[in-house]
């Protein structure tokens, strides 16, 4: 009979995916306030900062040349062009955090999530849906950040983005923010209680109790 050994800690990778305006960023900020142990992966982007955003907090804001340098140097785990701007996830921070046993949270688009899955097959995708396209349009307009033609372009793209929801393990319908946040917290908690996660985080205890490794 094989038993669990003292394996190196390995954290979970959570990916929050959504079309623009579904409430992804607000949910991620609220989740981090609720659970500071989560490590937010700070993506690089060539888009301009939105009101209230700070470089190095929500995103690392870079120009096209710097983004190209990072991409060409293979320093990005994934990258994609979304609504005319480039987004990418630095590789080192995720590797270091998961090796140290920390859970990592990525706020990402479906293209990036697909690439992350190639590197981390056990990554958990959480797709956030709006309650309706009409509500999505209302939220985009209420943000007051985009011109009408930009909003129209985002709405046009939303259908294609939503079509990739089946690629995620979980789906949250963000109709009531407090309910959606509770559901997001529950997903994180449930993932941490999986046998595979508990076996790594509590390897010594499992070994002492004689719990066999999962096959």
Swiss-Prot record:
One of its GO terms (cellular component) is cytosol. It catalyses: GMP + ATP = GDP + ADP. Signal peptide: none annotated. CDD domains: GMPK (cd00071). It is an enzyme of class 2 (transferase). Its main location: cytoplasm. Residues 11-189 form the Guanylate kinase-like domain. Keywords: ATP-binding, Cytoplasm, Kinase, Nucleotide-binding, Transferase. The keyword Transferase applies. ATP binds at residues 18-25. Pfam families: Guanylate_kin. PROSITE patterns: GUANYLATE_KINASE_1 (PS00856), GUANYLATE_KINASE_2 (PS50052). It is found in: Cytoplasm. GO terms for molecular function: ATP binding; guanylate kinase activity. InterPro entries: GK/Ca_channel_bsu (IPR008145), Guanylate_kin-like_dom (IPR008144), Guanylate_kinase (IPR017665), Guanylate_kinase_CS (IPR020590), P-loop_NTPase (IPR027417). Its EC number is 2.7.4.8. Belongs to the guanylate kinase family. Essential for recycling GMP and indirectly, cGMP. PANTHER family: GUANYLATE KINASE, GUANYLATE KINASE-RELATED. This is Guanylate kinase. It comes from Bordetella pertussis (strain Tohama I / ATCC BAA-589 / NCTC 13251).
């Amino acid at each position: 009979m094989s038993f669990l050994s003292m394996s190196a800690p390995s954290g979970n990778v959570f990916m929050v995916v959504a079309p623009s305006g579904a409430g992804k960023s607000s949910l991620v900020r609220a989740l981090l306030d609720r659970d500071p142990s989560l490590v937010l992966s700070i993506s690089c982007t060539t888009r301009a900062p939105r009101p209230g955003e700070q470089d190095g907090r929500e995103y690392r804001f870079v120009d096209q040349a710097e983004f190209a340098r990072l991409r060409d140097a293979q320093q990005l785990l994934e990258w994609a062009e979304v609504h005319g701007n480039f987004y990418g996830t630095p590789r080192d921070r995720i590797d270091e955090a998961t090796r140290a046993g920390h859970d990592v949270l990525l706020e990402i688009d479906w293209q990036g999530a697909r690439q992350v899955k190639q590197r981390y097959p056990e990554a958990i995708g959480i797709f956030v849906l709006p309650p309706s396209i009409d509500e999505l349009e209302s939220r985009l307009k209420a943000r007051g950040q985009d011109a009408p033609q930009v909003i129209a372009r985002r709405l046009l793209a939303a259908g294609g983005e939503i079509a990739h929801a089946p690629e995620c393990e979980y789906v949250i319908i963000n109709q009531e923010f407090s309910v959606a946040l509770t559901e997001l917290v529950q997903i994180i908690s449930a993932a941490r209680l999986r046998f595979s996660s508990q076996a790594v985080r509590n390897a010594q205890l499992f070994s002492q109790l004689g719990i066999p490794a999962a096959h």
